[in-house]
Amino acid sequence: MLSGNAKHPHPDVHAGTAAGRQDEPAPGPAAAQHLDVLVVGAGLSGICAGYHLQTSCPGKTYAILEGRDAIGGTWDLFRYPGVRSDSDMYTLGFSFRPWRSEKSIADGDAILEYIRGTAKEFGIERHIRFGHRVLRASWSSETARWTVDATVGPQGTPARFTCSFLYLCSGYYDYADGYMPGWPGMERFNGRVVHPQHWPADLAYDGKRVVVIGSGATAVTLLPAMAQRAAHVTMLQRSPTYVVARPSSDPVSAWLQRRLPASMAHRATRWKNVLLGMYFYNLSRKKPDLVKSKILKGVRAQLGPDYDIDKHFTPSYKPWDQRLCLVPDSDLFKSIRSGKASVVTDQIESFTETGLLLRSGERLDADVIVTATGLQLKVAGGMKLEVDGTRMNPAQAFMYKGMMYSDMPNLAVAMGYVNASWTLKAELSSTYVCRLINHMDAKGHAWCAPRRTDPASDEEPSLSLRSGYVQRASNILPKQGSRRPWKVHQNYLFDLMALKFGKVEDSEMAFGRAGTAASVDG
């Protein structure tokens, strides 16, 4: 069974996964420190995991390893102007710590403060070890433990941990590098080129001409934020994205908070937003033409009949083939109407000394060019995974219940939804991890491992979006099956029933004791 020591809990550890090269030499010998559960990553998912572990598995020792020097994950990394959530905070926030602000669409600083405040309020901070970059994890069926190797600090000091259960909460973004296409003539440009993922603190753009390359969530966030200080901001896009305006405050939530206790008002608002989001997504899939017409009608209402909506705001794909872009309080459209910002739909021929030459022959002069061209994905944070000496490739694995890899024992992954707030699924995953750990203890099992009993069944990519960052990573992403529990459902109600209330044991989950092989050939 999984070990635990309620009398002498081990201080939590916070570490992150490898962000750079994946072929570093193994750390030198070091005394391994054992924990019942090792969590990797201290963003939204990691803090959520810490809360559920200490609440539902109070006798277990756990630690959180964080590769960076601060709590917050994505929300500590991204510092570009206007950074904000495109999900409401009643669902992006935790169920156990209600969001109190009237603004439901929060800026990055408010979200970061919320995550830090949660870690402090529930004593999760003391379980975090910063500057721990995880390189590899090796499972031994003989001991029923993972051995996790990491480096610490700028000197890369070796550190080793063992754990009975490994929970990866590091997301799927590559923190080290964003996606940057190579354009001809970039070296000729006399201005400054920046990527939003690594925003320079010294960038001055007051009164300057700015071109933002891209049309996704980052680009539509940057345009209105930078337009407040720049002389003019142009969003250059190769093709349009669906853009939906929404108030940053939730009037229904405000009404409920005036009439109900705070916790009850939060739950009601959370469920209202969950159900409305599911309804809109399902309507988009079943009646895409209807949803498309309503979205474009909203854009025309913002920009007027003379604006070329067809060229600049009408995508060639259906709603939710890619994520929709949310603009709070119509800020993007207000910037365009004011003349401080504009949208150009074209392709880059080359950089020039003064800006960009487009395929159409048009030139865009710029002092600053921002490449909001997307993210790169990194599965399991780039760490190496081994089971009984065999290298495991997540791209060859299937997702079990959307949160575990096939044939990898005592390992779970916190993943969010592509069509709803990340935290909704991450919190359900943490709930299930705790249920699984407690079940193994009750039954005397040392390990569990998802096993596909019908390998010939259909397979599909685990992420079905057509977004560029997903398509670029198609060769590294795990797979999903066509039937449960191997089907990844982008549906909160379905996952709620499966992960919080469903059976832990099924025909696709194997259990065993230490000394019995958990590897696929065992």
Regions found by a protein language model. Give the residues of each.
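C-terminal, flexible cofactor-proximal segment of oxidoreductases
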Residues: 4-19, 219, 242-245, 254, ...
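Short beta-strand to alpha-helix junction loop
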Residues: 99-117, 129, 213, 283-292, ...
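Beta1-alpha1 glycine-rich phosphate/pyrophosphate-binding loop at the start
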Residues: 2-15, 32-40, 44-128, 237-238, ...
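Rossmann-like dinucleotide-binding core of oxidoreductases
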Residues: 27-34, 38-39, 44, 48-70, ...
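Glycine/threonine-rich phosphate-binding loop and adjacent beta-strand/alpha-helix elements that clamp
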Residues: 71, 368, 372-440
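Catalytic cores of eukaryotic secretory-pathway lumenal/extracellular enzymes that build
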Residues: 85-105, 135-137, 173, 178, ...
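Feature captures the FAD/FMN-dependent oxidoreductase FAD-binding
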Residues: 103-174, 350
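C-terminal catalytic lobe of FAD-dependent flavoproteins
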Residues: 287, 295-354, 358-384, 459-522
